[in-house]
């Protein structure tokens, strides 16, 4: 059984923070080969300047350890799209309490092919619970197509651009999407946060 945590940095134990850092390092640096500089003093952990007290973490846990994660950042503070990838947006990136950013999204449970979408929908639902009406992200056009195939409502914030061999695009998602709520209600109702019964039927 997979459990899901949704916590701020201070809500995670030191052991969980270390395991999350190792998982992110394995996925984003070792496996995907991202050219990112970690701010962690520990060699095999990946954290950056956007991991701060206002950050919200979504962490999927199996008996073997972390098997997925995502990160939510308020756009009223520093965040990836605004501070690193603003050129992907046709207009100024948002700075709005009703808009959050999703980043560091990954899933790696081979025995659950739907885990990636479950974590994605849970991240949107968590953002909605925190007061977001929309969620922005920087991703590849391949991931954009993956989201569309899985029924995700989204819109581009600017045209795709080639960056270091990858075609990146900035996109925005409505935080509340019935498709995602239906999936979570079917498989993991215990993951839902603050959903009124009238919205969950």
UniProtKB/Swiss-Prot annotation:
Keyword tRNA-binding: no
EC numbers: 2.3.1.184
Record SUPFAM superfamilies: Acyl-CoA N-acyltransferases (Nat) (SSF55729)
Record Pfam families: Autoind_synth (PF00765)
Keywords: Autoinducer synthesis, Quorum sensing, S-adenosyl-L-methionine, Transferase
Catalytic activity: a fatty acyl-[ACP] + S-adenosyl-L-methionine = an N-acyl-L-homoserine lactone + S-methyl-5'-thioadenosine + holo-[ACP] + H(+)
One GO MF term: N-acyl homoserine lactone synthase activity
Database matches in InterPro entries: Acyl_CoA_acyltransferase, Autoind_synth_CS, Autoind_synthase
GO biological process, one term: signal transduction
UniProt keyword S-adenosyl-L-methionine present: yes
Family, similarity comment: Belongs to the autoinducer synthase family.
Its biological purpose: Required for the synthesis of BHL (N-butanoyl-L-homoserine lactone), and HHL (N-hexanoyl-L-homoserine lactone) autoinducer molecules which bind to RhlR and thus acts in elastase biosynthesis regulation.
PANTHER family hit by this protein: ACYL-HOMOSERINE-LACTONE SYNTHASE, ISOVALERYL-HOMOSERINE LACTONE SYNTHASE
Record-given protein name: Acyl-homoserine-lactone synthase
Organism: Pseudomonas aeruginosa (strain ATCC 15692 / DSM 22644 / CIP 104116 / JCM 14847 / LMG 12228 / 1C / PRS 101 / PAO1)
Gene: rhlI
């Amino acid at each position: 059984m997979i459990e899901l945590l949704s916590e701020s940095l201070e809500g995670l134990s030191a052991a969980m923070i270390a395991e999350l850092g190792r998982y992110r390092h394995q996925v984003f640096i070792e496996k995907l080969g991202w050219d990112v500089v970690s701010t962690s003093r520990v060699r095999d952990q990946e954290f950056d300047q956007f991991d701060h007290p206002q950050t919200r973490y979504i962490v999927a846990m199996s008996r073997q350890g972390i098997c997925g994660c995502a990160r939510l950042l308020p756009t009223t503070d520093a965040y990836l799209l605004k501070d690193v990838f603003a050129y992907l947006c046709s207009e100024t990136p948002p700075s709005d309490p009703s808009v959050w950013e999703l980043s560091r999204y990954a899933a790696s449970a081979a025995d659950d092919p739907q885990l990636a979408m479950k974590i994605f929908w849970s991240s949107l639902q968590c953002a909605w619970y925190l007061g977001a009406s929309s969620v922005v992200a920087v991703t590849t056009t391949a991931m954009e197509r993956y989201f569309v195939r899985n029924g995700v409502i989204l819109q581009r914030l600017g045209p795709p651009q080639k960056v270091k061999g990858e075609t990146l695009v900035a996109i925005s998602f409505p935080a509340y999407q019935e498709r995602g709520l239906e999936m979570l209600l079917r498989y993991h109702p215990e993951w839902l946060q603050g959903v009124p019964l009238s919205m969950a039927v």
